[in-house]
């Protein structure tokens, strides 16, 4: 074998300026997500990368796209190191390793987009078509591949721009991702035209197409924002206990934990009657079914306050000879009876279970202490007597298909209970809430959110955050929402737009691998 032919990639073949441009794209993309959440940057973030990739070999474009992905996702997901080091009690070098592996995996997506875009350009496929289709197609694929990780989809950068995000009730978040990707291509064409000093550098047709799509999107948004919410009024009281993660599961602290939630619940309901009291994920740090002393106190509290209550607590049930452990929420009636339970369906990999544990038994030894939870078996809309609710536990709120399923099952209010204490005072809680805003708009139902350490919030069916609490403070949040009708194109037909982009991306990829025509050689 001729080992002289085995060479490392020639990174020097790409000018340093182009690498800096790729890094700049990643930095701009990271800054567009919360926090700091400078959302306009998303509309220009890819222009430096596209300029760097111009007329380059597709393999070099792949490297540049990978560099952009590394810079972007390292900036967005840096908080992974906080979770692993501070709460996982693992050495910092392990946390950096975990972050590096995740970021490297995610960076493959923009790398593949850059590669296919350049191959497509060499075969006459317009960037105006290929880039938005490939970006959205792969972004949608990322939501399902390798357990699914739809965190930081491009459209989420615009969660506070209400006129823009109303289109999500038709296209989901992916419609905005498509529009942002398209805008970046148009900007790139304008810059390239002026830089090349072409006689007619202004891409008139591209600009007109973009402006028409933007105007239609914004006009639709303003129209939807002026449609009054017609559902029945429903009062909620949300409790933020601010229980320190380091003592949360300490049995000696259970009494104080329950007392904190009792005190805050009475404070919330003293401000006025409530139809639903909501405690966060695992607010009751014990098995609600198997701890009569504290469970009876919580049931008594619901009777005292004359309200339905959602209480986050682990649960268990028999599955043949073994016990299944579940991350659950119990619904209590105003009479203190348990009238429903919702179990978490989409578990956190390496947080609540170990993927492929049976095939890779050695992994369990490497991650000792990881929870051994089982996923819930069914989507259940729980009836409060005044309206049905769908409960999303923890990061289930980032999966559009779960919220859609709960609403299709009859839920008229989505309730997200979570414990974001793991994230510390990082960007992660803000990124988390930005995604739940879209679940309300997509399904045209309000969403209320109770988080152990924040951000607790009330979001109406238009995506307007009507109230939110600060991080790491005890807090109560009272408010009134209008129960949704759950009638939207997205709720009825799902990710039709995203699937159309997947199909378009597949066609682009197929054409990109065809033999070059003589005209383009």
UniProtKB/Swiss-Prot annotation:
Pathway annotation: Protein modification; lipoprotein biosynthesis (N-acyl transfer)
Main location: membrane
Keywords, alphabetical: Acyltransferase, Cell inner membrane, Cell membrane, Membrane, Transferase, Transmembrane, Transmembrane helix
Pfam entry (one): LNT_N
EC number of this enzyme: 2.3.1.269
Membrane-spanning intervals of the chain: 27-47, 64-84, 93-113, 125-145, 167-187, 202-222, 493-513
GO biological process, any: lipoprotein biosynthetic process
Role of this protein: Catalyzes the phospholipid dependent N-acylation of the N-terminal cysteine of apolipoprotein, the last step in lipoprotein maturation.
PANTHER family hit by this protein: APOLIPOPROTEIN N-ACYLTRANSFERASE
Protein's recorded name: Apolipoprotein N-acyltransferase
Source organism (scientific name): Geobacter metallireducens (strain ATCC 53774 / DSM 7210 / GS-15)
Organism placement in taxonomy: Bacteria, Pseudomonadati, Thermodesulfobacteriota, Desulfuromonadia, Geobacterales
């Amino acid at each position: 074998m001729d080992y002289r032919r085995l060479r490392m990639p020639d990174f020097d073949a790409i000018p340093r300026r182009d690498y800096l441009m790729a890094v700049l794209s990643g930095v701009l993309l990271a800054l567009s997500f919360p926090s700091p959440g400078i959302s306009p940057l998303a509309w220009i973030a890819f222009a430096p990368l596209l300029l760097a990739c111009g007329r380059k070999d597709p393999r070099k474009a792949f490297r540049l796209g990978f560099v952009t992905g590394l810079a972007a996702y390292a900036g967005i997901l840096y908080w992974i190191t906080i979770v692993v080091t501070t709460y996982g009690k693992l050495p910092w070098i392990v946390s950096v390793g975990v972050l590096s592996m995740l970021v490297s995996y995610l960076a493959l997506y923009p790398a593949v987009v850059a590669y296919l875009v350049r191959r497509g350009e060499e075969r006459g496929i317009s960037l105006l078509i290929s880039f938005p289709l490939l970006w959205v197609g792969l972004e949608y694929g990322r939501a399902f591949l390798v357990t699914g990780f739809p965190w930081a989809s491009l459209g989420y950068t615009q969660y506070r721009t209400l006129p823009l995000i109303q289109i999500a009730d038709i296209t989901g978040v992916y419609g905005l991702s498509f529009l942002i990707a398209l805008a970046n291509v148009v900007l790139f064409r304008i810059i390239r035209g002026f830089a090349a000093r072409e006689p007619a550098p202004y891409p008139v047709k591209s600009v007109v197409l973009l402006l028409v799509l933007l105007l239609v999107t914004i006009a639709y948004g303003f129209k939807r924002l002026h449609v009054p919410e017609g559902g029945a009024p429903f009062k909620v009281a949300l409790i933020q206990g601010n229980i320190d993660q380091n003592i949360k599961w300490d049995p000696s602290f259970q009494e104080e934990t329950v007392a904190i939630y009792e005190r805050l619940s009475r404070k919330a309901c003293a401000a006025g009657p409530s139809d639903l009291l909501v405690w966060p994920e695992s607010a009751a740090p014990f098995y609600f079914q198997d701890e009569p002393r504290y469970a009876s106190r919580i049931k008594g509290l619901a009777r005292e306050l004359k309200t339905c209550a959602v209480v986050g607590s682990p649960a268990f049930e028999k599955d043949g000879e073994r016990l299944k452990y579940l991350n659950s929420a119990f619904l209590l009636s105003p009479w203190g009876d348990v009238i429903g339970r919702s179990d978490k369906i989409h578990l956190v990999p390496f947080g609540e279970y170990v993927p492929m544990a049976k095939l890779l038994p050695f992994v369990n030894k490497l991650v000792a202490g990881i929870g051994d939870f089982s996923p819930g078996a069914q989507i259940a809309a729980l009836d409060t007597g005044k309206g049905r609710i769908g409960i999303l536990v923890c990061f289930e709120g980032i999966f559009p298909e779960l919220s859609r399923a709960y609403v299709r099952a009859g839920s008229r209010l989505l309730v997200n209970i979570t414990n974001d204490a793991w994230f510390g005072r990082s960007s992660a809680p803000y990124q988390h809430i930005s995604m739940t805003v879209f679940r309300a708009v997509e399904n045209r139902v309000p969403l209320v959110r109770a988080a152990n350490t924040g951000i607790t919030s009330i979001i109406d069916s238009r995506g307007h955050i009507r109230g939110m609490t600060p991080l790491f403070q005890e807090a109560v949040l009272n408010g009134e929402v209008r129960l949704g009708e759950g009638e939207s194109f997205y709720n009825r037909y799902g990710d039709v737009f995203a699937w159309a982009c997947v199909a378009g991306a597949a066609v682009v990829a197929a054409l990109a691998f065809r033999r070059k025509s003589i005209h383009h050689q």
